């Protein structure tokens, strides 16, 4: 039963693959590629800038979290030592 179902699907996929690219998928000519190049570079630059800014903000916030965590642990250790010396 599986063979009867898979053979027609295989034939259709093979026919689509051998057909080649559709006209809309054809490679663009060199002139249109160079015309779109500045727009593509601006888009790439903007995306890179946004990602870089987001990464820097993440690092800054992560640094703040690390500093806060160390401050709390140091303060807790100091309080713990005071309790030990006071009540010992």
Curated annotation (Swiss-Prot):
One GO BP: very-low-density lipoprotein particle clearance
One example GO MF annotation: phospholipase inhibitor activity
Entry's localization field: Secreted
Origin: domain of life: Eukaryota
GO cellular component, one term: very-low-density lipoprotein particle
One Pfam match: ApoC-I
Keywords: Lipid transport, Secreted, Signal, Transport, VLDL
Major localization listed first in the record, in broad terms: secreted
Signal peptide (residue range): 1-26
PANTHER family named in the record: APOLIPOPROTEIN C-I
Function as written in the Swiss-Prot or TrEMBL entry: Inhibitor of lipoprotein binding to the low density lipoprotein (LDL) receptor, LDL receptor-related protein, and very low density lipoprotein (VLDL) receptor. Associates with high density lipoproteins (HDL) and the triacylglycerol-rich lipoproteins in the plasma and makes up about 10% of the protein of the VLDL and 2% of that of HDL. Appears to interfere directly with fatty acid uptake and is also the major plasma inhibitor of cholesteryl ester transfer protein (CETP).
Recorded family membership: Belongs to the apolipoprotein C1 family.
Protein name: Apolipoprotein C-I
Organism listed in the record: Neotoma lepida
């Amino acid at each position: 039963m599986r063979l009867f179902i898979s053979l027609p699907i295989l034939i259709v996929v093979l026919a689509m693959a051998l057909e080649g690219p559709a006209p809309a998928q054809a490679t663009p000519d060199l002139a249109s590629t160079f015309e779109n190049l500045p727009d593509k570079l601006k888009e790439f630059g903007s995306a890179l800038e946004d990602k870089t800014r987001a990464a820097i903000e993440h690092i800054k916030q992560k640094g703040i979290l690390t500093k806060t965590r160390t401050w709390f642990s140091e303060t807790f250790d100091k309080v713990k030592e005071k309790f030990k010396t006071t009540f010992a």
